[in-house]
Regions:
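Class I (Rossmann-like) S-adenosyl-L-methionine-dependent methyltransferase catalytic domain
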Residues: 1-74, 109-166
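Catalytic P-loop NTPase motifs of RecA-like helicase/translocase cores
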Residues: 66, 89-90
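A conserved beta-strand element that flanks and buttresses the S-adenosyl-L-methionine
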Residues: 82-85
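Flexible, active-site-proximal loop/turn residues at the rims of small-molecule/cofactor binding pockets
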Residues: 87, 99, 116
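A short, conserved alpha-helix within the catalytic core of class I
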Residues: 90-102
Length: 166
């Protein structure tokens, strides 16, 4: 499903890695692993931060990376997939489900974090080509579980972890 808002302009922090890369539980899962960051933006701060704990991060972003780069990333296989601050900038549940299912094709463990905005639960357009859901992390649980039948989906504070059932 095509996204109505590309969220290209939401990749704005070139100096600080997304919070998921410093969350204790997420760091423990990623340490020493290969990681694909789905919708990771135009900057490499995530890869740089994760190198400290031995994780090798490849970033896929259809709006901020070249088609050649993205094809090479998707050709790989990974231990962990990260979706950080992505679901909250997509205005369609179907498109959010597509992102989650893409991540699930690349790794058996997903780490998902969202920016909660004002926490009102009322999504709104924030710029010409940008959207913010303003939903709390817990509010994404049902739709993530629906997108991942046969997976265990659990929330740990502001982190959602999904793992394939074995």
């Amino acid at each position: 499903m095509k996204q109505r808002f590309t969220s290209k302009q939401t990749s704005i922090n070139g100096t600080k890695a997304p919070a998921v890369y410093s969350m204790k539980r997420a760091v423990n899962v990623m340490t020493g692993k290969t990681v694909v960051d789905i919708g990771g933006g135009r900057f490499d701060t995530a890869a740089e931060a994760a190198r400290v704990y031995g994780a090798a991060v490849s970033i896929y972003d259809p709006f901020n990376r070249t088609p050649e780069h993205n094809a090479a990333v998707l050709a790989g296989s990974y231990d962990v997939a990260v979706i950080s601050n992505v679901l909250n900038v997509i205005d369609s549940e179907a498109a959010r489900g597509d992102v989650v299912r893409l991540a699930a094709t690349k790794a058996a463990v997903l780490l998902i974090a969202v920016y909660e905005g004002d926490g009102s639960g009322t999504g709104r357009q924030t710029a010409a080509d940008s959207w913010q859901e303003n939903r709390r992390t817990a509010d994404y649980m049902d739709e993530i579980a629906a997108a991942l039948p046969g997976w265990n989906v659990a929330r740990f504070g502001r982190l959602i972890q999904a793992t394939q059932k074995r």
